[in-house]
């Protein structure tokens, strides 16, 4: 989010939170949003050491400023990857990342019908999830995935869950696991 209402990820408080505090495993990170103060401790959940930080590379988080929620998942994905991107160490999911978590059973649904597939996603969504996708036509809003699975535009000063995303360097190897919630990947860094 951004206190001034901007929907530009690279200028947002979330960008600072993820790429400064979370990435560096800071013990205390504070910011203010709409006259409300927040303090976070990332010493146990952020990247704990340089070895871990060196396993992460700069990545391009693709997004689209599409406004047509009548498109299906593949159309959004193609538009996101043909459009602009932000470059950073840690980013947010884009709308198509979330929709791909439903598997192939929902791929032909339109973005505005994803609430029909919420139970099929492996991503937990209890309060709504921020995406990196800006939406320009409605006054600098940002797309979020609501807790019922709908993708819609909201003001960037609202509060929702953050799912940090990152790109690993090519030398990082999967040594165990299948990527499921019951058997997550174990990495050799």
Task: Please describe what each predicted stretch is.
Residues 1-189:
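Collagenous Gly-X-Y triple-helix signature in extracellular proteins
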């Amino acid at each position: 989010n951004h206190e001034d209402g901007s929907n530009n990820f690279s200028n947002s408080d979330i960008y600072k939170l993820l790429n400064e505090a979370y990435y560096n495993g800071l013990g205390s990170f504070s910011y203010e949003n709409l006259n409300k103060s927040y303090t976070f401790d990332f010493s146990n959940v952020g990247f704990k050491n340089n070895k871990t930080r060196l396993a992460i590379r700069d990545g391009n988080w693709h997004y689209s400023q599409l406004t047509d929620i009548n498109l299906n998942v593949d159309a959004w994905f193609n538009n996101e990857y043909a459009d602009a991107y932000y470059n950073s160490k840690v980013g947010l999911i884009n709308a198509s990342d979330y929709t791909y978590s439903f598997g192939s059973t929902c791929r032909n649904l339109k973005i505005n019908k994803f609430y029909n597939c919420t139970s099929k996603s492996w991503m937990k969504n209890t309060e709504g999830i921020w995406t990196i996708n800006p939406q320009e036509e409605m006054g600098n809003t940002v797309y979020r995935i609501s807790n019922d699975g709908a993708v819609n535009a909201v003001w960037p000063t609202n509060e929702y869950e953050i799912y940090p995303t990152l790109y690993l360097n090519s030398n990082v190897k999967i040594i165990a696991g299948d990527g499921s919630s019951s058997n997550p990947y174990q990495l050799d860094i």
